[in-house]
Amino acid sequence: MGLEKSFILFSLLVLVLGWVQPSLGVESRESSADKFKRQHMDPESPSKSSPTYCNQMMKRQGMTKGSCKPVNTFVHEPLEDVQAICSQGQVTCKNGRNNCHKSSSTLHITECRLKGSSKYPNCEYTTTDSQKHIIIACEGNPLVPVHYDDTV
């Protein structure tokens, strides 16, 4: 009888885990490289962003769920060009690690900054377009971007 109860409880546990696991969200299975692409790559946008670009993109790319991400940068260049930065000048990252690389040329970027008066869930951002060098952290073999470190 005890073995039968254990089997039933185990079966119920497996069933519950089967329901819970698919609802854990994309972020829990997202690789660092995929997260970098989601948070920072937007090669399709025109050279000049609209004033509401950041409000739309930050929400669309999942950076206003649970809280407002204070700062984010989108790169408007082909992914291959950004991946190529991983073989360019190596520099020290803000956190002291040595896996960062600085772009040899300027890239079209949009910087999104949370407005001072903005509070979750109504995240509002300022949108600033510019041409600047970027610094990204790269990992793996082959090296791929996994973190946006700075704009210079």
UniProtKB/Swiss-Prot annotation:
GO terms for biological process: defense response to Gram-positive bacterium. It is an enzyme of class 4 (lyase). InterPro entries: RNaseA (IPR001427), RNaseA-like_dom_sf (IPR036816), RNaseA_AS (IPR023411), RNaseA_domain (IPR023412). It catalyses: an [RNA] containing cytidine + H2O = an [RNA]-3'-cytidine-3'-phosphate + a 5'-hydroxy-ribonucleotide-3'-[RNA]; an [RNA] containing uridine + H2O = an [RNA]-3'-uridine-3'-phosphate + a 5'-hydroxy-ribonucleotide-3'-[RNA]. Its main location: secreted. Residues 31-53 are annotated as: Disordered. It is found in: Secreted. Monomer. This is Ribonuclease pancreatic beta-type. The lineage of its organism: Eukaryota, Metazoa, Chordata, Craniata, Vertebrata.
